């Protein structure tokens, strides 16, 4: 295995482990992984207590796990689209050369 591949693998391992070491088990209770929506809503209510939202969501997931699943599914679909785009362009470039 070439040296640059070893460096790349070590870089991936470091990038994977760094957040786990930095937060060392602290989670949502301490606010590390709180969503921006909740923080923004709290700030709006603090600034203007009489504010009324324009609309309500037509469906809310029944649990946080389902919400996380939908978010992960959305990220996976986006990654597939981006991967397809890069693969398509790479194959097109290789065919031209």
UniProtKB/Swiss-Prot annotation:
UniProt key word Magnesium: no
Keywords: Cell membrane, Cobalamin biosynthesis, Cobalt, Cobalt transport, Ion transport, Membrane, Transmembrane, Transmembrane helix, Transport
GO biological process, one term: cobalamin biosynthetic process
GO CC, any one term: plasma membrane
Subcellular location: Cell membrane
Pathway: Cofactor biosynthesis; adenosylcobalamin biosynthesis
GO MF terms held by the record: cobalt ion transmembrane transporter activity
Membrane topology according to the record: Multi-pass membrane protein
Reported function: Part of the energy-coupling factor (ECF) transporter complex CbiMNOQ involved in cobalt import.
Protein name: Cobalt transport protein CbiN
Organism: Methanococcus maripaludis (strain C7 / ATCC BAA-1331)
């Amino acid at each position: 295995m070439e040296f640059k591949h070893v460096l790349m693998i070590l870089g991936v391992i470091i990038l994977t482990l760094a957040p786990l070491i930095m937060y060392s088990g602290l989670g949502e209770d301490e606010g590390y992984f709180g969503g921006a929506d909740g923080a923004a809503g709290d700030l709006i209510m603090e600034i203007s207590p009489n504010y009324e939202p324009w609309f309500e969501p037509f469906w809310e997931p029944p649990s946080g796990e389902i919400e996380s699943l939908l978010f992960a599914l959305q990220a996976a679909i986006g990654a597939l689209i981006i991967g397809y785009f890069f693969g398509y362009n790479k194959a097109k470039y290789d065919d031209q050369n």
